[in-house]
Amino acid sequence: MYNGLHVHYTSNLKGEFVMNKEIEKQLYVELSSLTKNKESWEENIDYVASLLENQSSKIVAKALWMLGEMGLKYPNKIENYVNKIASFLNSPYDLLRERSLNALGRIGRADFNLIKAYFGKIMDLSKDNCSNVRLSFIWASENIATNTPTAYREYISIFVELLDDEDNRVRMEAPEMFRVLGKRKPEYVKKYIEKLTYISEHDTERVVRIHSKGAIKAILSNI
């Protein structure tokens, strides 16, 4: 098992505890090494989860991402930490909301029941002020919908709105949710073929047009 570094904190002028930057760097390198060593994931879930209490948002973000990947592979071993992971959906830090969504999406792909209690809050973040969070919301939804598409039956309108998002990257990703659902539950999204067709012909971003065409193809191929 990986041995956590003995971390020292210092107090800044505001009385806040901050991590020594060199220690933070070493810990991040350690986590990056563990990320590549998938054979050690199962025995290190508890250790990585303990880092959710770390004072460094960079370390917490890395831990959240890793727990999502670990949870996809070992969902039965991540159950005790899902509540803590979901608590970051309310974080004041954009990055931590992103990573919480990413993690819950991967865990939910493996076992929807593990994240079901937090599904409503996940959906709320579709309207987050941060475009990166909205993007992560779509990614998480694609993961969950891969194996539990029925969870989205009453939420299609949310993704219709995201097709018109002001952020280019969000608009690029939004049609992908229609592609995922089109392969599994085309009846949920077939009524939006006309809108997707318009987007595929008129959106200013080439990737948006391509992804919209891909969504249309997926829907029509499975009706």
Predicted regions and their residues:
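Alpha-solenoid repeat junctions
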Residues: 71-74, 108-111, 145, 178, ...
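Eukaryotic acidic, Ser/Thr-rich intrinsically disordered low-complexity regions
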Residues: 193-223
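Alpha-helix N-cap/helix-start positions at coil->helix boundaries
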Residues: 21-25, 57-58, 94-95, 129-132, ...
